[in-house]
């Protein structure tokens, strides 16, 4: 499927490297768009591995610990965990991403997400393999809604487009939870500068034809709280 965004492509990439946004956008301000577990604000960790960037959010949901990993491989490959198959209430080992997508710039103010929905035992249920299902997985809400409804219950599309067609980073006030955004933006700037100097950007595989290992996923472990 494809989703067209009326904003710069970096704004869409920012969302994937801001794993805490799921707690506020998808679990609190707009109500429960996926599951109650998303509303929990977890412990964040970020990892930089070559041109791969991972944002890990570890939440406690009752007797379970839910580790969700968002993934960006530069310049534009993104994945996260599942949207509906994992809710932090049952054991799950390396459940795979609900979508695999390329975020492609059209111009400074527009971009397109070219995406594949992943359905089955390790992805989301087949019942979501519909146009509306893919939109809910991608943005938290279906996208063809009245303006008033989109303002009351915004999804990812409203969040990334709501900053305007192209944001000025100079006026931002980034927080510790935005560390993933900081490090990947810094790397993109360096790669652009190197490309202008004639240096080809690095590739995610060691040599042409190698399988690229990806890490977007959910793991849920039963770890009851200890009585202290």
Model regions and ranges:
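C-terminal catalytic domain of Rieske-type non-heme iron oxygenases
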Residues: 1-228
